[in-house]
Amino acid sequence: MKLLYGTGNPAKLDAMRHRLAGLGIELIGLKDLGGVKQPEIIEDGKTPLENARKKAEAYFNARHMPVCSGDSGLYFDNVAEDDQPGVHVRTVNGKYLSDEEMTAHYAALAEKYGGLTGRYKNAVSLILDADHRYDAMDPSMESAPFRMVSTPHPMSKNGFPLDR
């Protein structure tokens, strides 16, 4: 089965291809569609699931093929609501952050709170056809808790600057 993974992030596409290896699924990304114009999607949901659904529906309606989209939110323990990234992990005060800007922002946040314990809450939305839609977001899909400190590790993965 050919399945469109609704992301423009090559690191996320590679990670999902690895997870699906051996299942008989040909996972393609948005860039694999060539120069076809993609719908503009404003990820303004309040939860990862709302954003995952929004992306899956937009890509399904535009491409008329099976689509899987995901979204994540980053949540820290004992951090003020104003400082919680939630679904806006890469966007701070309306600005989309580069990998380097993300590293600096979260290092400063860790400094402010004396270190952070966080986790990613993840959601997926799968649309096979008009009659078969599946959504999931529950605690079993969350990342393991992790610790973030103000001094970044020198090694990082392109596209995943906080995963060091």
Task: Describe the residue ranges of each PLM region.
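Anionic-ligand binding patches
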Residues: 2-4, 10-164
